[in-house]
Amino acid sequence: MGGWSSPSHWLIILLIVVLLFGAKKIPELAKGLGKGIKTFKDEMNNDDEVAKNTQKIEENKNTTNNTNADASIDETKKA
């Protein structure tokens, strides 16, 4: 009824994990998990940077297109 908040439940789970993987393998698994999480976070941050750079490029293209359109209007008025 208390769910998984009871310390005895966590102790049983820890015992099962130790029996399945062995005491030597657990630190290696934790290290691998930590590296995986770090890599995931780094890639998420990298995706944010790529999105920002893409947005800047699109804004620059729009500004360049508007400038070119203004220049051709000026040339048309001169002719």
UniProtKB/Swiss-Prot annotation:
Keyword check for Cell inner membrane: yes
The record, for Gene3D superfamilies, names: 1.20.5.3310
Give the subcellular location.
Cell inner membrane
Query: Where are its TM segments located?
Result: 1-21
Protein topology in the membrane: Single-pass membrane protein
Please indicate if the UniProt record lists Signal as a keyword. Answer: no
- Listed InterPro entries: TatA/B/E, TatA/E
One Pfam assignment: TatA_B_E
Instruction: Give the record's GO CC terms.
Output: TAT protein transport complex
Quaternary arrangement and interactors, per the entry?
The Tat system comprises two distinct complexes: a TatABC complex, containing multiple copies of TatA, TatB and TatC subunits, and a separate TatA complex, containing only TatA subunits. Substrates initially bind to the TatABC complex, which probably triggers association of the separate TatA complex to form the active translocon.
Recorded hits in HAMAP family, A to Z, give: TatA_E
Query: Would you identify the family this protein belongs to, as annotated?
Result: Belongs to the TatA/E family.
Protein name, per record: Sec-independent protein translocase protein TatA
**Record organism:** Campylobacter jejuni subsp. jejuni serotype O:2 (strain ATCC 700819 / NCTC 11168)
